[in-house]
Regions:
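Transmembrane alpha-helical segments of major facilitator superfamily
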Residues: 51-59, 143, 173
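Structural signature of the two symmetry-related core transmembrane helices
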Residues: 78-92, 171
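Hydrophobic core of transmembrane alpha-helices in multi-pass small-molecule transporters
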Residues: 21, 90-94, 100-120, 124
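Residue-level signature of mid-helix packing/kink "hotspots" within the transmembrane helices
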Residues: 56-64, 147-148, 152
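Helix-breaking motifs and short loop linkers at transmembrane-helix boundaries and internal kinks
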Residues: 74, 96-101, 180
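Helix-to-loop junctions at the C-terminal end of transmembrane segments
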Residues: 60-75, 157-159
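Symmetry-related core transmembrane helices of the 12-TM Major Facilitator Superfamily/SLC fold
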Residues: 150, 165-181
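Helix-loop boundary and gating motifs at the non-cytosolic
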Residues: 3-56
Length: 181
């Protein structure tokens, strides 16, 4: 039987674990439930598909460019911080946006800003944890746990709130990820 993960007292590892938890909680809520929010805002299936597809296409180009620039300028932490803030602001604008074009534009900005977060945070984690003689697995574990909690928790929350309010749970997860970096 595998040993239970140890709770780390290393501040870097703790902050990184919190970041992974918040970021993956965001994904755990956003991935399955964002289309329900779009539907609650009156978007039809075709428009929902466009809102989801356009940022995905943009990320194919943006992620390699952003991560390359972060590597070249040795700015992993700064790029993570900027991406978190721009992603948070973008998702906040999504929640306030009126109409499919505004939602699409704001969501594209948010997702392009957030798209390199996993690659950058993994590079940041491996570098920092390696320098401290710490393992990556126990820190990254909290992301997986939070993703599942976001999936299940948002499902329960949707029994108590209207889908139109779900965006604010997504924004809250991003607010929680910012201070953890």
């Amino acid at each position: 039987m595998a040993a239970a993960p140890q709770f780390s007292t290393d501040r870097f590892a703790l902050k990184l674990g919190l970041f992974y938890a918040a970021y993956f909680f965001f994904g755990g809520v956003q991935l399955p439930f964002f289309p329900l929010w779009l539907e609650a805002r009156g978007l039809d299936a075709r428009t929902i598909g466009m809102v989801i597809a356009v940022p995905t296409l943009m990320r194919i180009v943006a992620t390699p460019l952003i991560t390359h620039a972060a590597d070249r300028h040795r700015a992993l932490k700064a790029t993570l911080a900027i991406g978190s803030v721009v992603g948070l602001l973008g998702m906040t604008v999504v929640g306030l946006a009126d109409g499919p074009v505004a939602i699409l534009a704001a969501f594209t900005v948010a997702m392009v800003a957030l798209s390199p977060m996993l690659s950058l945070s993994d590079a940041y984690a491996l570098s920092g944890l390696g320098a401290r003689g710490r393992s990556y697995g126990p820190v990254r574990l909290w992301g997986s746990v939070a993703f599942i909690a976001g999936n299940v928790g948002a499902g329960f929350i949707l029994e108590a709130i209207a889908p139109g309010h779900l965006i604010w749970l997504i924004v809250f997860a991003l607010i929680r990820s910012r201070p953890a970096i």
